[in-house]
Amino acid sequence: MNWHNLSTILAVLTSLLALIVCGQEDNLGLKNGYISLSTANWDLKLVKDAQVLASLTPKGKSFDFLPFDYLSVRTENQQYHNGDITFSYRATGETEWVKVDSAKSRKAVTVVQAKDALAAADLMPTLPANSPLRIIRKWVDVDGDLGMSFTATNTADHDVEIGSLGFPTEFNSIFTNRSPEEMSAKCSLTDPYIGMDAGYLQVTPTSGTGEALIVTPMDNTSTPFEAWHNLHEPYFDSTAYESQTFEGFYEWLVHSTAYAGTEWRKAKPWNPPTSRILEAGQSTTVGLRFSVVKDGIRGIQKAVRATNTPLTIGTGYVVPRDLTVQLRILAPADIVSVTQTVHYFITESAPDAVARLGQFSTSTMWFTDTSDPFGRAPSIMSYDASTKKPVLQDPRVWIAGLSDEGGVIYMATAMKQSAHPDTNEIAKLEEFVSKVLFPTIQNGSDLVRKSIFFYEPSTVPGYSHSKSIDWGNWWSWNKADSYSTQRSYDYIHVVATYWALYRAGRDQPGLLKQRTWQWYLSRAVNTTIACFATDSAGRELVQYSRVGQMGETVVGELLHDLRREGWSKEADAVEVSMKKRADLWNSQAEPFGSEMAWDSTGQEGVYYWSNYFKLTSTATKTINSILGYMPTVSHWGWNGNARRYWDFIYAGKLQRIERMIHHYGSSLNAIPLLTQFRQQPKDTYLLRVGYGGVSGPLTNIRQDGSMYNAFHSFPDTLVGDDYSGDYGPNFLGVMLASATYVVDDPDLGLVAYGGNLAVDGQVVTVQPRDAVRQRIYISSMGVYIVVSSGWIDQCSFARANAKQVTLQLVPGPSKATSAIVWVENPGSSTQYKVTSQAKAMRGGWQVQLANVGVEVTVASA
């Protein structure tokens, strides 16, 4: 279903909303109206009966961070709102926890008069009668912001242990029955920093523009952000809770011991679980503060500091063992004692992790049964870490069918060769291409099949489909559906594989044995042209080819290489196809279409070609869109984590709607952010988010070299998925975007993201420590240097007024004998070139790499 048809359908569905939900109960009490309140920064409404937050808009503005327009279909018991509370308690000495939930069986709360509050209520009517905890909730003005506090008093004659204490959150992330334009205009997205006393939520408009919102602990309370707990609600068609159009809501947990010992007992939590003892008659107050971020998304970190919440800023939170990172702690001077957690993930050196991926995928994941009736041998198959075997059957046939994002783990191995070629791995990839990819996945043509595994037993006599699998779902395609060539996303996987082998063979002659580099380059071109072809009326011949593709930056790399090789006819053909799409996007209000109602995948391609053709307005719109769903926080899992929550359904072993940590959205969306940063080197927010996105997916490579689809974020799991799943496109982003960035950061000073930096007098020396080690950007000069093979061992330049860079290039593990050095100046009007001895070639300068390396100088022209 294409984006524009979907818009029309959703608009029609919206008009039918009242008919769909006519049977829903008004347990919330909307019939009795609202209480309208305001502070210096907010206009807000409370539901009169429940005194939960119904609407929250910046003062004098119309943008509502809450789904007030959907409140009439969110009135049932167990539908959560800001102002609800959940907790578990037990008498000291007891073992069983008693769960309490203010949304479970709603009753009108009792109004409490409080001079220090905008509104206050006793929640006892809506809590179980036998609860020993009396809860008073207050809505208060906190320096113009909105505060929400709960005071719990132990009314029992014995001590009570509070084992969990949670604040459900509700913001307007409901996409159901909205058009793309409405989603952008009305919706917002929530991301957590689970950092204990320094924890906070950031709520950002989907458009990425306008004011944002942060939620922080209230001053003078002990309200740590200990855990982020997904909430279950009843399902109604009107909102479709926990679906592709409505991820669902979460709660901020102050304490989590009760969960840690029960539902979460198999998981390792982000923070040590705690509880709180209330003696008989004792009270405790906890609370949250809702603050407007008037400077928008880029002002979030500054706004957090303004609430007296400690803040940390670092050069990344995924740390290879050979990399030194920086962390700055920004806290109020009068702070007494707080506990903050900064979450790091320590890996082997990035190239070592990449090498393990290549070794594992071409051994343990290598499938050689040539009797396979589907023609899948030899190939690199999807992998299940729980069984330690390739996935040869799955009802989602593409996972076992070497196509779709969930079945193309071979693309990760291929992309690895583009930077770190290995003779044995390339030999197996060439065998795969000649025996499976070209003759079967492509059927010897330029088209690409949706899957080469299928469920149609009559066509494969003698093959035994597993009887333990349910083959009755839509995704168990028959042969005709599997062999369809009508999914454009599948073409990019094939293009990337051909391109990667071209680059490996082009830069290191002798690596390719079965085909020439020219053959691989030609195959990449032909597959690209087939993917984006149109009829005489301009209509797509392959479905979805008009929208942005996952990983299509590789098409841009292909185009550059065609120009460098002098293949002008082929380059012109690719460019014409891309220009048509870019012009279309430039005419659309929301050009980020996909197979889904809302997605975070089209932005990469939309940005690439809008930026390429200098369609600045659309490129800027795209960057804003990405920042709307991609945060930077001091947590390896959430820093640079692009919002995705449905692909465990399509490519995971554990299938559920769940926020995914470092799925392919992270690395692919990092590409536009880092590209834009190179053009605007003073906008370091882009670098912080983008670097988090490109480094995060390194955590998906296990120590044995196997890979996982994404990390499960629900607190009852917190592990990587067993399936390799969609990691192929994810690793493509890692290979295309990894680089070292040297920047004078306003908060950190002169630092290197992805490298080790040292200053000796006026000389700065940087040693790259990223996954590729072939790209470095120096923001003070605005120069971006890329080498085609080998490694950049180190570079040096003057601390002030630098006019040249000296690089030390080495052969690297692939033992490269020569390299092309390409020099770009995206962040400067100054032109740079290689001034040391070199030969002009392929749009750059070729240098010979001796065994000990070679020194190359890049200076202003």
Residue ranges and their predicted role:
Residues 13-25:
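N-terminal signal peptide
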Residues 122-176:
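Acidic, contiguous internal or C-terminal segments within carbohydrate-active enzymes
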Residues 333-365, 371:
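Extended acidic/polar, glycine-enriched regions
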